């Protein structure tokens, strides 16, 4: 049996005495700090204090000449699509474009005029009057879904209206192209920081030949003129995710994964040749949903993503090659103009990037970065961003930093970033009492993790867990979220599943329904399906595909596990709403079976709920769930309906959750549910801690164990190894305790 050397226990947290004992303040490296022209001396002081080995500029800040000789790496934020209004103004036809859809308007006679820009901000968007509307626009009767003939509508340029021959009391929309005359990210930063005198930055289309040639030559000149810059931080490449403002400068539509602003007649003509069929605006505007990630992607939209990946990655490689030719590193920011790069797609590695950096808002968004292959290193920009909205009246930057690190840390222990950093106005962070001390603690713990793991991987269970949705591996760690870790009432009960998984001892795969039909790999023991009915994450019409349901039934029947959260396998068909109701042991009452009596009774005595005290948080939950079949057990109920149910199905198990928002307790419940579903309960205590607020990570090759307290209170927890009690630990709030494991 493995034992612990109690004399080798090492504690790390924010306490100054503890930092002195562990030597954290003496460590350097793995940290990037922002700077600006008016904070040179303070930058040097903080660089030395925090042990930073890289400095960077940001949008709205400058790298001071006085810091160019500092013995650290210098990052320069580089924009391929903006910060050159002169070029954009000289070439208005090559300004970036976006597909918009007008308001839905009801005709009350046989003629209707639709104002195109109603509800849009005219400082951001301008109707494209240069290209033929009859070729690139589309008018649709939304009552019937039919496309209105181009002979039955006219564009009135002077009024920016479309006049349509209509059927009374039918609804109509116009899909049209507009120029992005104010870069969306610059507009966001302008509004957020209340900039007054900064010119609006136009955004130009690097995909088009004239601009492409200009941008390449400009990059070469920039590299020659900036010999002291070590890392070119592309922010990013060519197409901005969809970020559209309304006429009151409020965010109107935000889709972090959106392709609506990656279009132009030039690009679309190339797509038509590549795809072999005619392009329609509807492929992009998608009835007004703009192909939100929650939509089941159409064949045409998947084709468009494939085409864009090929084109974007090939052109990005040309820019990266230029950077490399000057002896510099090329880094990509995962955000802003990242559309088309698809880091989990099959073309990304061909770009040849040295690094990827992205914003870390949670464990999920950290894994979104740290799991990327095909680069030499990854970097996470931790929160909070040093902007006035946080570092101002009513803001709580220290609290935000603590919460951000608590979620990020558990994911780092599973899949570490190589570096961390911050962004924004360093002066704001420097002047906020206690904030720099908080960063010291975070950076110290990050370095300690790397020192103790020493490039090895943490222990994982002897089986894989797969998340099943329509996107599969293309959007690894990206599902069930609206906009990059932004909380939404409609999503947090599902997104919590991925947040829990991000720090758990499992290898997690993301698979699509096409993958299922090809056969489930033997190393996958548990499959999770989570989401609302008819979304891409639940699966919609895929659940009436005979090959899908029979393959999954066989998988569970032969010993696999299937976990459903929310409305899994949902599609009303043949007397069922949950198409795998027989596997899950539950279905949802849609009103059709109210005449059928249900006799549901709770029995919470189960392996999954051991160690669990108090009520379970199901978030928004899913209502009207009832258990059915002969082999179910209801572990939690809300009135007469079920919230947590387990079900025996052949040699395997089904588990159903009405919802699962992130919390330490829900992480523990899901952990136990996965081991139960896999039929491998005995493996759970290979390495285990009893308190639900704590988690354990083991680096077997280094004989190191980390126990973390994910709460803001002191707690006791018992450590088990190979099922045997080893030691009781008392952990301070947020503490990370390291122990040496010896034979």
Language-model region placement:
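The substrate-binding groove and active-site-proximal loops of carbohydrate-active enzymes
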Residues: 29-34, 53-54, 194-213, 296-313, ...
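A short, well-structured beta->alpha microelement
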Residues: 31-44, 58-62, 332-341, 499-520
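Catalytic domains of carbohydrate-active enzymes, especially glycoside hydrolases
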Residues: 38-73, 221-233, 407-414
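Hydrophobic targeting/anchoring helices
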Residues: 50, 86-88, 219-220, 233-237, ...
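A short helix->loop->beta-strand "cap" motif at the edges of active sites that frequently abuts
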Residues: 72, 327-328, 376, 558-561
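Polysaccharide-binding and catalytic clefts of secreted carbohydrate-active enzymes
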Residues: 92-350, 368
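Extracellular ligand-binding/catalytic regions of CAZymes and related secreted enzymes
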Residues: 243-246, 427-459, 576-579, 584-592, ...
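A glycine-rich, often tryptophan-bearing local segment used as a flexible ligand/cofactor-contacting loop or short
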Residues: 539-615
């Amino acid at each position: 049996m493995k034992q612990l050397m109690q004399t080798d226990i090492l504690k790390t947290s924010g306490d100054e005495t503890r930092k002195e004992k562990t030597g954290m303040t003496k460590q350097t490296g793995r940290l990037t700090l922002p700077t600006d022209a008016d904070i040179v001396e303070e930058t040097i002081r903080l660089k030395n204090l925090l042990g930073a080995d890289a400095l960077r500029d940001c949008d709205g800040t400058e790298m001071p000449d006085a810091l160019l000789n500092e013995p650290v790496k210098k990052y320069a934020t580089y924009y391929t699509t903006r910060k050159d209004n002169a070029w954009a103004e000289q070439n208005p036809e090559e300004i970036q474009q976006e597909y918009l859809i007008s308001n839905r308007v009801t005709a009350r006679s046989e003629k209707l005029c639709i104002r195109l820009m109603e509800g849009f901000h005219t400082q951001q968007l301008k109707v494209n009057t240069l290209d033929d509307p009859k070729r690139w626009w589309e008018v649709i009767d939304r009552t019937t879904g039919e496309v209105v003939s181009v002979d039955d509508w006219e564009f009135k340029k002077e009024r920016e209206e479309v006049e349509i021959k209509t059927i009374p009391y039918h609804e109509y929309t116009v899909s049209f192209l507009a120029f992005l005359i104010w870069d969306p990210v610059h507009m966001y930063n302008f509004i957020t920081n209340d900039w007054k005198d900064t010119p609006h930055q136009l955004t130009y289309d690097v995909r088009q030949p004239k601009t492409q040639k200009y941008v390449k030559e400009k990059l070469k000149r920039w590299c020659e003129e900036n010999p002291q810059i070590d890392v070119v931080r592309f922010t990013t490449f060519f197409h901005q995710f969809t970020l559209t403002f309304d006429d009151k400068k409020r965010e109107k539509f935000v889709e972090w994964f959106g392709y609506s602003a990656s279009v132009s007649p030039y690009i679309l003509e190339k797509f038509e040749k590549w795809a072999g069929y005619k392009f329609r605006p509807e492929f992009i505007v998608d009835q007004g949903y703009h192909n939100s990630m929650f939509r089941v992607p159409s064949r045409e939209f998947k084709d468009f993503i494939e085409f864009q990946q090929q084109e974007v990655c090939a052109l990005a490689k040309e820019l990266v090659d230029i950077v490399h030719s000057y002896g510099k590193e090329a880094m990509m920011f995962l955000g802003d103009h990242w559309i088309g790069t698809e880091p989990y797609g099959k073309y990304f590695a061909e770009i040849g990037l040295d690094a990827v950096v992205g914003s870390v808002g949670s464990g999920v968004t950290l894994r979104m970065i740290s799991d990327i292959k095909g680069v030499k290193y990854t970097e996470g920009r931790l929160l909070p961003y040093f902007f006035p909205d946080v570092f101002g009246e009513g803001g709580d930057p220290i609290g935000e930093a603590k919460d951000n690190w608590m979620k990020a840390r558990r994911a780092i222990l599973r899949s570490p970033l190589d570096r961390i950093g911050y962004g924004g106005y360093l002066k704001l962070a420097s002047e906020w009492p206690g904030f720099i001390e908080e960063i010291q603690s975070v950076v110290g713990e990050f370095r300690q993790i790397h020192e103790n793991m020493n490039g090895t991987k943490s222990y994982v269970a002897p089986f894989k867990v797969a998340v099943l949705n329509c996107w599969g591996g293309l959007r690894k760690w990206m599902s069930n979220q609206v906009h990059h870790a932004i909380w939404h009432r409609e999503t947090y009960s599902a997104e919590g599943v991925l947040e829990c998984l991000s720090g758990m001892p499992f290898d997690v795969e993301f698979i699509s329904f096409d993958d299922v039909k090809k056969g489930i790999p033997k190393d996958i023991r548990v499959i999770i399906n989570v989401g609302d009915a008819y979304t891409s994450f639940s699966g919609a019409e895929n659940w009436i595909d005979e090959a899908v349901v029979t393959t999954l039934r066989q998988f569970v029947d032969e010993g696999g596990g299937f976990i459903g959260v929310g409305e899994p396998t949902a599609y009303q068909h043949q007397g069922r709403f949950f198409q795998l109701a027989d596997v899950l042991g539950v279905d949802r009452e849609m009103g059709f079976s109210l005449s059928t009596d249900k006799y549901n009774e709770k029995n919470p005595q189960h392996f999954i709920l051991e160690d669990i005290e108090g009520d379970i948080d199901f978030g928004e939950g899913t209502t009207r769930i009832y258990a059915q079949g002969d082999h179910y057990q209801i572990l939690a109920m809300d009135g007469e309906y079920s919230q947590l149910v387990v079900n025996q199905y052949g040699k395997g198990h089904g588990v159903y959750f009405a919802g699962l928002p992130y919390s330490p307790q829900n992480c523990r419940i899901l952990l136990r549910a996965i081991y139960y579903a896999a039929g491998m309960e005995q493996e759970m205590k290979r390495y285990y801690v009893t308190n639900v607020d704590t988690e354990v990570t083991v680096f077997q090759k280094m004989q190191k164990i980390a126990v973390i307290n994910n709460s803001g209170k002191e707690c006791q927890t018992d450590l088990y190894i190979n099922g045997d009690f080893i030691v009781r630990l008392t952990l301070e709030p947020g503490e990370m305790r390291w122990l040496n494991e010896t034979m």
